[in-house]
Curated annotation (Swiss-Prot):
S-adenosyl-L-methionine binds at residues 84, 89, 135-136, 154. Its main location: cytoplasm. Specifically methylates the N7 position of a guanine in 16S rRNA. This is Ribosomal RNA small subunit methyltransferase G. The keyword GTP-binding does not apply. Residues 228-253 are annotated as: Disordered. It is found in: Cytoplasm. Its EC number is 2.1.1.-. NCBIfam families: rsmG_gidB.
Amino acid sequence: MIPDALTPAGRELLRRGADDLGLDVAPHEEQFARLLALLRAGNERLNLTALKTEEDIVLKHFVDSLTTLRGGHLDGEWKTLDLGTGAGFPALPLAILRPELRLTPLDSIRKKIDFVRETAAELGLSNVTPQVGRAETLGQSAEHRGSYDRVVARAVAALPVLAELALPLLRVGGVFVAQKGPLSEEELDAGRRAAGEVGGRIIEVDPFTLPVSGDARTLIVLEKQRPTPAKYPRREGVPTHQPLFWKAKEQSR
């Protein structure tokens, strides 16, 4: 039996953050409490996240993950891939609050995906199918290329890198929601050019502050307009080390 890990202060923090986003977490608080307990227990064994305190986990994992719901781009019964999920963020909070989403959390580190799989089962999340692998490989596989309605990612790479990794996985008309910190004009321009190169375009740039903490965030929404050229994504590691239209040393959060 997983103990109730959310203190009254933690529950209030979760409610305030969700309220700021126009979301109702009240029916799901027990799942978030169990998720916190599981994350803390798993972190002791597996070193899953640098965030340790209840406040940091609630704000910077739970609430931060839910900000990807801004704009309504994830509202629907979408087949959705979480690119670079790590310990399951934003996939697990999204699965809790949006059970209609069909989520595939992707990470190259098996221990993290094993944790996500076990945690989803413990939380009763039947809409989560974790996958071990790299986006470069999945993006060139017949099973995954062009098969997703939505891709979501939180701050895992520079925007041009994310565009090359995410857009090949989307069907034409699909949408990629990327969450990053403050975004420079240079990175945005490179991301716009990279998106065009791999078959898409940026349709929305939404700067905002994280509820409660006030940390700066940016949601960038890209739409896939045409099939991605066969040469993209490039082989493993190349998109990160040789980003399209962007010097690797310039990469930011």
